[in-house]
Amino acid sequence: MGDKLKLYGFNNLTKTLSFNIYDVCYAKSEREQKDYIAYIDEQYNSERLTRILCKVTEMVGAHVLNISKQDYDPQGASVTVLITERALPAKLIDKSCNLGKYSNVNENINSKEAEILSTRDSVVAHLDKSHVTVHTYPEYHPDNSIATFRVDIDVSTCGQISPLNVLDYLISSFDSDIITIDYRVRGFTRSVDGHKLFMDHKINSIQNYIAKETLDKYDVVDINVYQANIFHTKMLIKEIDLQNYLFNTDVYELPPKKRLDITDSLRKEMIEIFSGANIYWCKYSTS
């Protein structure tokens, strides 16, 4: 980051990172699609998502004030974490904050805490003026043999904490076939002499904060509006290892032509999601 800026008072800049990933899977029948949705829903339930967000909080050097989480019927999950840049004395923390202490995430709690927390149907994590949230969206259609799973993660911070440093961890935490990342900086802070600062770090692309070995696996496109401190990066996986996209099916059970057809359909689905447009519409089929 280079030399640190000398600021007057608190750093009032708000830095928001929106991270969206898509996992694509081939499931031929409606039954297989439902089984896939059930499987992925269990794999990325609120417990696992909470652990991921707590790790994100740790990586940005923040402290958890409160955690809330919820699994939904028939599928999907949400977790919200409120965080603080600095550890706060217990007397300053609102009594409604659970500090992330609930039985399935933090086993080192006393019996009184466990009794209180066991009565809660949901748990949320919050930061002081900053927060981390995650939501999941499984999806399929009976007329299409491809099911998708979307994860939306938002990290909003104030002060010196930067959410960009957790990108590699987030990408590796999910089966990320398509990734959309948005980063924006809002507000202003001041230098000691009163000069307004609308940005406190150097950036010309979100790619600056993603490891080269990660970028090498994707086709990457940037759309940035520097004057507005808006940065946008889209990533599309380059190689498709078909076995990794088949649900309850071995690739060697399929004839070569079928493998090519499925791979083609997967690629078309990914391109449409990446482009945000119905390029191929429903003119292709893998049934």
Regions found by a protein language model. Give the residues of each.
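Polybasic/polar functional segments that serve as interface/processing modules
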Residues: M1-S287
